[in-house]
């Protein structure tokens, strides 16, 4: 999505504008390293995120470099992973402080980043994984990638379905890629002392906020 915006001459964060080389993700072999680079070295096969990556050579901050697993993963596959993988690992593990056995809900789970979140939650041993999408034709895909329950976030009863799934407690953690109309409902669907990690604005960046629900 961001690459299409930049290709059309728009901006994404600090990148963009007419003449900008497109690309946020890439993979390849390291040919040079700075003096203070840690954990990777010349010759390593890596996947990275950055800007202007659709080029023969690209520069990456070593903190955004991930070694490609020592298996048969090819560069094409690896180049599709860095942004989604880093974004969702940060949201679920670093900020969300997810613990094995907890319940998790991913709003906007049918997006590329959301699909990665389902897989991370599955690998980390979530007790129950709930994913949302407004497109019912994508429900089977979400289930195939780890969702135990799939809901439509525009269904007025989705919060009740979450509560029914979690013994009326709500989930331990919500990763919200939507914002907008989901903000107040998210608070209703979260367990007391649970966490909501806001990642995206696919449903809008401005909305009414119910302070009573937050209290």
Predicted feature residues:
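NAD(P)H cofactor-binding loop motif with strongest signal on the N-terminal glycine-rich segment
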Residues: 108-109, 178, 201
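Glycine-rich beta-strand-centered segment in the early N-terminal region that forms part
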Residues: 3-52
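Glycine-rich phosphate-binding loop and adjacent beta-alpha segment
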Residues: 142, 181-215
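Short, glycine/polar-rich helix-capping loops at beta-to-alpha or helix-loop-helix junctions
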Residues: 53-56, 133-143, 205-211
